[in-house]
Amino acid sequence: MVNEIKQAIANILHELFPNAEIYDEDVPQGFKTPSFLIIVVESSYKKAIDEKYNASVSFDLAYFPEREYESKNECYEVSQNILRAFDVLNSYKVTNKTSSITDNVLHVKFTVKYREIKTSQFEKMRDIIFN
C-alpha cells in the first residue's frame, strides 16, 4: 500500500513539476536540481472491528530548488502548489499538511489515512452429490 501511495505522490509531482527529478527515500551523489525526495517518516496500522484496519502513513517531501540565489521564493511557490494539489491521493485522504524551509530546502509534511479490510482465505466448497 505504501508503494502505491508513493507512486501517486510521484505522479502528481510529475504533473505539477515535469522538469524536476523525483527520488525515493535516498538522494544519489551528484543529484540534479530541481528535485524532490519522497520519505516515509512514520506509519501506523491499527485493528478496528473484525477484519477492518485503520492505517496512516506520514510523508516528508523534500524539495531541492533549482535557483540557489532565489531559493526561498521558489520554495514558497512550490509549497503553495503542493499544498493545494495534495488533498486526495488515489482516493486516500491527505491530512495534517504543513510546510517549512530549512537550509534552503523545502519540507512539505502530510499524513495519508486509509482503511483496509482483510479477506480470509477459505478452502472452496467441493461439489456435493445428492442421491
Go through the PLM ranges and name each one.
Residues 23, 39, 62, 111-113:
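Residues in well-ordered beta-strands of folded domains
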Residues 21-22, 92-97:
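Short beta-strand elements
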Residues 9, 13, 82, 106-110:
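Hydrophobic beta-strand residues in large extracellular and virion-surface proteins
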Residues 69-89:
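Short, hydrophobic/π-rich interface segment
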Residues 1-3, 45-49, 54, 95-131:
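Short, charged interaction patches at domain edges and termini
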Residues 1-44:
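Small/polar-rich, solvent-exposed N-terminal microdomains that initiate assembly or binding
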Residues 32, 37-76:
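A contiguous binding-surface segment within folded domains or other stable secondary-structure elements
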